[in-house]
Regions:
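N-terminal targeting signals for export/organelle localization
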Residues: 13-92
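A short beta-strand-turn-helix
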Residues: 94-114, 135-138
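Short pre-active-site segment immediately N-terminal to redox-active cysteine/selenocysteine motifs
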Residues: 113, 120-123, 150, 223
């Protein structure tokens, strides 16, 4: 009888393990951010951050821990791969990007290179991925173009103007890859035409996967075929992205 009770308790504990881990993760992050905000401000100030709000500085400092927590709590980051890439019903090279600077550029200019398209935000837990994106761009610019699409769709984490966004990215992360004009990236009447293509399988020929949060990533190959989707928690310099770029 005693053994049965022990086993029952064991299985109950196992069934609640994931829920407990999620709770502990949130609690740990909350405590961490509190401690950073009140005792780590001087340390954050020494990390070459300029024109950042307190929130942005805290998020920047917390990003490595946030990434580590995702790993140890078994976060299932999603990567979708197009196993049978074929020409899309509508060519992405027919589309034009309205840039942050006010200029426009046709995507046909990038034909023959891979394209990594990322929806971005300045006040997100993943904002420090700008650093990884810039590093990825610098190391692969002969074969890869990265384009950031600032958007305020997720918890209003990009409230700045195009001028604010450009300044923030340039001063704090040294961003030199193209930034699009701020727009909406989720399905709806205001959705950016590029993301209309990315999230409609009738246009791209593969998937209707919409961004799950800021810093969702879409990879398009040299022929203009959408071949990968990476969740926000996938680092731009992680193995998943690097392997896809090398193909």
């Amino acid at each position: 009888m005693g053994d049965k009770i022990v086993w029952d308790l064991y299985f109950m504990a196992m069934s609640k393990q994931n829920k407990l881990l999620r709770f502990l993760k949130k609690l740990f992050i909350a405590l961490l951010l509190f401690l950073i905000a009140y005792s780590g401000y001087v340390v954050i100030e020494t990390r070459n951050v300029k024109d950042m709000t307190i929130r942005q500085k805290v998020l920047k400092a917390a990003y490595p821990v946030f990434t580590w927590l995702n790993k140890i709590t078994g976060n299932k980051s999603k990567v979708f791969t197009n196993e049978s890439p074929a020409s899309s019903p509508q060519s992405i090279y027919d589309l034009t990007i309205a840039l942050n600077s006010g200029d426009s550029i046709p995507l046909s200019n990038y034909e023959g290179k891979k394209l990594l398209i990322v929806n971005t935000a300045s006040d997100c837990g993943y904002t420090d991925q700008y650093d990884d994106l810039q590093k990825l761009y610098e190391e692969n610019k002969d074969k890869l173009v990265i384009i950031g699409f600032p958007a305020n769709d997720f918890k209003e984490q990009e409230k700045g103007t195009d001028v604010d966004i450009e300044k923030f990215c340039r001063l704090n992360y040294g961003v030199t890859f193209p930034l699009a004009k701020k727009s909406s990236v989720i399905p709806g009447p205001e959705q950016n035409p590029i993301f209309q293509w990315l999230t409609d399988k009738n246009k791209n020929g593969w998937t209707s996967k919409k961004p799950s949060w800021n810093f969702s990533k879409y990879l398009i190959n040299e022929e203009g075929v959408l071949v990968n989707y990476f969740d926000p928690s996938i680092s731009p310099t992680g193995k998943e992205v690097m392997d896809a770029i090398k193909k």
